UniProtKB/Swiss-Prot annotation:
Protein family: Belongs to the SmpB family.
Pfam families: SmpB
Protein name: SsrA-binding protein
InterPro entries: SmpB, SsrA-bd_prot, SsrA-bd_prot_CS
UniProt organism field: Bacillus licheniformis (strain ATCC 14580 / DSM 13 / JCM 2505 / CCUG 7422 / NBRC 12200 / NCIMB 9375 / NCTC 10341 / NRRL NRS-1264 / Gibson 46)
Amino acid sequence: MPKGEGKVVSQNKKANHDYFIEETYETGIVLQGTEIKSIRAGRVNLKDAFAKIERGEVFLHNMHISPYEQGNRYNHDPLRTRKLLMHRKQINKLIGLTKEQGYSLVPLKIYLKNGFAKVLLGLGKGKKKFDKREDLKRKDAKREIERAFRDRQKGLI
């Protein structure tokens, strides 16, 4: 199964707007019982989330998983730091890359694969304001071309 294939629960659309994503990694995530139930219900927000490498392990910060509605007083903390599961070789590679100026680890999406929650982690370099404007211009031009082509096709048929 290719990376990122499975039932997508949540996507971080802002990540592609703010970063040039150069590589992606599929990681497992350590969760508590009520957290996986909330994820399956789609109650996850990746908007402000980021990953950090601490003591040779990868941790995900600021990912909001809403408390499980049918949970009891032992429900989880919505913004707790969660450990990501990766191979040692991948972590060592990321340590070297994130030490370089401007590289960040950003969660792109969270999805369910074979019953397990997975996080697609992207290694990205921050975009400057002019890069974002350039991307918007490129998207608008592409949209205009597609619209003109579609209108032309309708006229010919």
